[in-house]
Amino acid sequence: MSNKIAVFASGTGSNFDAIMNAVESGELDAEVCLLVSDNIKAGVIEKAQKREVDTVVYHPKSFSDKKAYESALLADCRDKGVEWIILAGYMRLIGPTLLEAYHNRIINIHPSLLPAFPGKDAIGQAVAKKVKVTGVTVHFVDDGMDTGPIIAQEAITITESDKKEEVQKKIQAVEHKLYPRVIQSLLTKEEAK
């Protein structure tokens, strides 16, 4: 039986596509049963709808506080039987309501070799610092920004001539292979327990 996962995303959805492609090819034994977004204009919403994935979009400012916002998300996740939450370009910190309900079952992908360049625009930060190596990190989510325990990392090289767009393409190529592989590894370990 496939593990039920929810993908949380705020942007274009390239990692969502990679996860869905891995599910469809059989590389990832999971069912993406829910897409959660906080951005009504996010490209990922259309991608999820085309693939007939149930989608909810909530604007956090529509709620009295973060707890109320996350309580609504938690209710949706529980309603769908979600076992894991996969952050894929979700631009909000996860708070105690979801962290407690999904302890060690929320993971994130970040476009740097953490702890270097946490937060927004990690690729831009790496290019500005003229580093020769950056990469991708998959980590468990805790209450900090990109501070949870690291699960996997993969490096890429940056040449002197690489612009931000070229580095982003290299990063995404790694993300789209690494994330489904790590998700499957975690699901397999969970099933073995």
Pin down the residues of each PLM region.
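Donor/substrate-binding cores of folate-linked one-carbon enzymes
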Residues: A22, M91-E190
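Helix-adjacent hinge/juxtasegments
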Residues: V56, S64-I109, L114
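Short glycine/serine/threonine/alanine-rich loop segments
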Residues: E52-V53, V82, V131
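N-terminal Rossmann-like dinucleotide-binding module
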Residues: M1-G43
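Hydrophobic packing residues within well-ordered alpha-helices of enzyme cores
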Residues: F16-I19, V44, A48, L98, ...
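Amphipathic, non-transmembrane alpha-helical secondary structure
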Residues: D17-N21, E46, S71-R78, K177-P180, ...
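Short, surface-exposed acidic-centric catalytic microdomains
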Residues: A30-A72
